Amino acid sequence: VGRQLAAESAGRSFNRWGSGEIEITGVRFLDAAGEEKSYFQTGDEMTIELAYMAHKPIIRPEFGRAIFRQDGVQVNGPNSQLAGIDIGTVEGPGTIRYNIKNLPLLPTLYQLTVAIHNAQLTHAYDYHEMAYPFRIVTGGTKETDGLVELPATWDWQPTTD
């Protein structure tokens, strides 16, 4: 199962485990201009950047992340394999980015989990559970209920007699 240890992120404690052949060395939230920030509005562009250090050659690692709402509801959980990205072999430092062009999340606090697994998803190299908070603030939408703003339109036609 690997090592279990407490880690710190912005003064917050989180669960971390994994064997350590690859380590997550940093996670940043970036806006459309590439500036680091921790708050966004619904509809903004957001990039999640994960920096890593592979201490030895690792074939086809899988990079994953999951967003959780503050009440623990998981919003999504994509990974590089599901996206069809062939990472190949990694060694040394690197970064991988997950780009969201139109952030559909509604205003509240969210927590990000990030992980690096082997290609079979059976072995964690490094796993940071709900370690990185970010906030969606009001102003990007009038909607307030639910998880996301769906890209939809309304169409109304009165009934004529």
Predicted features along the sequence, with ranges:
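Localized sequence-composition bias
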Residues: 1-161
